[in-house]
Amino acid sequence: MSTPSSSLTTDESPASFILPDLVSHCPFPLRYHPKGDEVAKQTVHWLDSNCPDLTAKERKAMYGLQAGELTGYCYPYTTPERLRVVADFLNYLFHLDNISDGMMTRETAVLADVVMNALWFPEDYRPTKGQAAEELNPGKLARDFWSRCIPDCGPGTQARFKETFGSFFEAVNIQARARDEGVIPDLESYIDVRRDTSGCKPCWVLIEYALGIDLPDFVVEHPVIAALNQGTNDLVTWSNDIFSYNVEQSKGDTHNMIIILMEHHGHTLQSAVDYVGSLCQQTINTFCENKQQLPSWGPEIDDMVAKYVQGLEDWIVGSLHWSFQTRRYFGDEGQEIKQHRLVKLLTVAPPPPPPPPTPPPQSSDADTKKQKVKAQDGKGPVSDEEVWALVRAEQSKGSILESLFGFLTTSLSRIFFGYFFAYSH
C-alpha cells in the first residue's frame, strides 16, 4: 500500500496527519459472528429504550457507534445469547465513557458508587449512605445486563469482572481529578491510568464468559498470561489514541498519548503519531512472542487457555477494523481513510463562554477609611491605630449615634473576618 506524502504534516500547525498501517501489520484473521448484525440491532435498541433523556444528537452518535458490531468482531464464537449480554455491556461502557467526560471528581465518584452497587447487589437496589432512594439510570442498566450475565458466569470470572470494573472507575476518578486541575500527566503516569480507563480489562474477563470457561486464578496470574493481557490492552488502547485523536483534540480533551508526547517530549503531531504507531507494532510482535512462551497446565486447562488467547487475538484485529467502520472517529469517511490513511484535522471547538463576572463586594466603612489612609500617606499595610485615628477625626462630622454605629459595625466586621480567615486557612 502506498504511503501518502508526509509533506502535508510537517508544518508547525498541520492541517492533517497520516495514520500508521496497523491493519496490515496485524497477523490475525478477522472473524465476525453469524448473528452479529441481528444482535447489534437488539443491543442498540436496548440502550436507546432505556435512556429517555438522551438528546437527538446523542442518539445519532449511539447508532453511529456500532458497539454491537464491535462485539460481533471480538466475540465471534460465543452463543447468540451471550453475545447479546456482552454487546449490551460494550454499549453501556461507551455510554459511561460519554457521560463521564467532563464530570468533576465528585460526580465520577457518585457514578462509580451507583454502578458498583448494582454489581454487588444484583437482586435489588440497596442504597448506601448518601445514595438516592431512587436508583439512578446507570445503576439500572448495570443491574439489567449483570443479572443476565451471572447465571452463566463462573465465580472466578464474576469476581474478576467486579474487580476490574472497580479499577476502571478508580482510574476515571484520577482522570477527572487531572481534568479538574488542568494537568496533563507525564507519559508513565498516563499509561498506567489509561490501562484502566480504557475499560479493556473487564472486556477481557468477558472473553471467559462468552466462551463458557472460568480460568483458575493461578493461570490468570501467570506472568505470560498477564503479559498477553497487558499487551492486548496496550495495543487496543494506544491504537485508539491514534484513531480518536482528531475528535479529542477538537474538543480540547488531553487524555491521549499523542497530546502527551507533544506536550512533554517535544514531538510534532506526525512524529507523535508515528511513535505511538511503532509502539503498537512492537506490541503485536511481543504478543506473538509471548504466545510461544505459554506453559502447559494439562489438556483441560490448555484448551481453555488456547480459546482465551484466541479471544485476545480477536479483540486486537477486530478493534482495528471496527475503528474504521464506526462513525465515532472518522464519521462517514472511515473506509476511505482506511485505504489512504490521511486524516484532516477538525476545527477546534471554541471554549464555553466564561461565567458572568462577580460584582465586587461592598466595602465597609472601615475598609473605605483604610483606603483613604493608604492614599494619603502612600504606605503599605494600614495599622488599626491609623484607621481609628481617621475614624475619630471623622466622627466629629456626625452625630454621636452615627459614631457609635460606625464603631460597632467595624468591630463586628473585624471579629467576623478574623474568624473567617482563621478557619479558612
Swiss-Prot record:
Q: Where is this motif: DDXXD motif?
A: 97-101
> Where along this sequence does the record place binding of Mg(2+) 2?
97, 101
Q: Which InterPro entries match?
A: Isoprenoid_synthase_dom_sf (IPR008949), Terpene_cyclase-like_2 (IPR034686)
The observed outcome of changing residue 251 to I is: Weak effect on catalytic activity
Instruction: Tell me the domain of life.
Output: Eukaryota
**What SUPFAM superfamilies does its record include?**
Terpenoid synthases
Record field: compositional bias (Basic and acidic residues):
366-377
Q: Spans of biased composition, class Pro residues? A: 349-362
Query: Binding residues for Mg(2+) 3, per the UniProt record?
Result: 240, 244, 248
Q: What class of enzyme is it?
A: lyase
Cofactor annotation comment: Binds 3 Mg(2+) ions per subunit.
Cofactor(s) annotated in UniProt: Mg(2+)
Q: Name one GO molecular function term.
A: germacrene-A synthase activity
Q: Which UniProt keywords apply?
A: Lyase, Magnesium, Metal-binding
Q: What is known of its domains?
A: The Asp-Asp-Xaa-Xaa-Asp/Glu (DDXXD/E) motif is important for the catalytic activity, presumably through binding to Mg(2+).
What's the name of the protein? Answer: Alpha-muurolene synthase
| Species assigned in the record | Coprinopsis cinerea (strain Okayama-7 / 130 / ATCC MYA-4618 / FGSC 9003) (Inky cap fungus)
